[in-house]
Amino acid sequence: MYQWIQRDSDVYQRWPWWRRLLIVLLVLALMSVLQVIVFRFVDPPLSMTMVGRYLEAWSDRQWNFRLHYVWCDLEQIAPSVPISLVAAEDQRFPLHHGFDFDAIKKALGHHSRGGHLRGASTISQQVAKNLFLWSGRSFVRKGLEGWYTFWIELFWPKRRILEIYANIAEFGDGVYGVQAAAQRYLEKDAADLDESDAAQLAAVLPSPRRYNIQDPGPYIRWRSSWIQRQAEQLGGSAYLDMH
């Protein structure tokens, strides 16, 4: 038995470096696909974004830092929440397959005319980044984000993507998911959120550590009203049921 293992090891060592690298990459690729398949059925106990927040706190010697994260099935979340998230972050979510090329084209056009480069990430891309990857901007992370997004869209129904997004999105410093945010900031459960509550939560998503749900400034109040109007124009929660 040992000789057989040793013989295979010797064969592997004689392979050229590029072949060994290819095998390693294939194994990593298969493992990443397996991750996606597992979370199609298993609710994630943590996301990589949460892990990163812990590391950030510990690097600042905040040893008592604790996340606020409470998983909540989509059936236990008020219908006003998913449509508010879609209205705020990705209005073509039911229509695309993970990448909104129209939004990407508009963002690049806006940037070419001298404007700042606006984000065009879909909800699916945000789930891929928040669940599996690290924060920050780099071509490597963006490439991996695209890889995970492809498999997420292939294996998960849209309903599952929204469910995980609603549970791992950050709504305040260390506050993840609509249930934790609703309890902490609005003293409600996610099932009891009305349209105004849901829009207020969704309004802080671009910069959850910058804006305060409990004490919203003029921008958040304006954005919350805008999200409510957009959700209504999309057709409310029926917009998600139709696709």
Swiss-Prot record:
Q: What keywords is this UniProt entry annotated with?
A: Cell inner membrane, Cell membrane, Cell shape, Cell wall biogenesis/degradation, Glycosyltransferase, Membrane, Peptidoglycan synthesis, Transferase, Transmembrane, Transmembrane helix
State whether keyword Transmembrane helix applies: yes
Swiss-Prot/TrEMBL GO biological process terms = cell wall organization; intracellular signal transduction; lipid metabolic process; peptidoglycan biosynthetic process; regulation of cell shape
Q: What class of enzyme is it?
A: transferase
* Gene Ontology CC, one term: peptidoglycan-based cell wall
Signal sequence span is none
Record's function text: Peptidoglycan polymerase that catalyzes glycan chain elongation from lipid-linked precursors.
Entry protein name: Biosynthetic peptidoglycan transglycosylase
Q: Which organism is it from?
A: Xylella fastidiosa (strain 9a5c)
